[in-house]
């Protein structure tokens, strides 16, 4: 709200833009499913790098309308990353263990999300929004590097 000079209600628009991005990328993934299957690690790597770039770009264009566009882009990219991740899990985990794996992943994901929201709130409050965005971009790039290093595992 400080960076964009918007009210708290603006974040509802931002969340809506993010959700629209998810819906659009779902349609894209449906249309390009064969390409995702043929290039799993690339289909995970590209959205990670692109999300890091978009995250940093937001800092240099602190404009409320552009932020909505960037929110939609991040929604699209996050969904495009999740589709090949899900396919990878389904192909590598035995069918009778799939429910357990998804359950554990959901618990870990929810717990990690909660902890990182708290941590990033603290960092933003004490060090500023720019540091939070930079940390987010760095984390995305670390994940991208790990995917690249382990790319043979995805074949």
Segments and roles (model prediction):
Residues 1-155:
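C-terminal transmembrane bundle of multi-pass solute transporters/carriers
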């Amino acid at each position: 709200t400080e960076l964009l000079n918007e009210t708290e209600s603006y974040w509802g628009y931002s969340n809506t833009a993010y959700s629209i991005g998810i819906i659009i990328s779902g349609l894209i993934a449906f249309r390009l499913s064969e390409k995702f299957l043929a290039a799993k690690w690339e289909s995970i790597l590209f959205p990670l790098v692109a999300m890091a770039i978009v995250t940093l770009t937001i800092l240099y264009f602190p404009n409320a309308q552009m932020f909505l566009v960037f929110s939609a882009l991040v929604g699209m990219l996050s969904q495009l990353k999740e589709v090949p991740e899900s396919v990878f899990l389904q192909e590598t985990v035995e069918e009778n263990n799939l429910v357990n794996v998804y359950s554990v992943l959901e618990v870990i994901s929810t717990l990690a999300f909660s902890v990182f929201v708290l941590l990033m709130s603290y960092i933003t409050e004490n060090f500023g929004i720019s540091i939070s965005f930079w940390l987010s971009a760095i984390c995305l790039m670390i994940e991208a590097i790990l995917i690249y290093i382990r790319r043979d595992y995805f074949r």
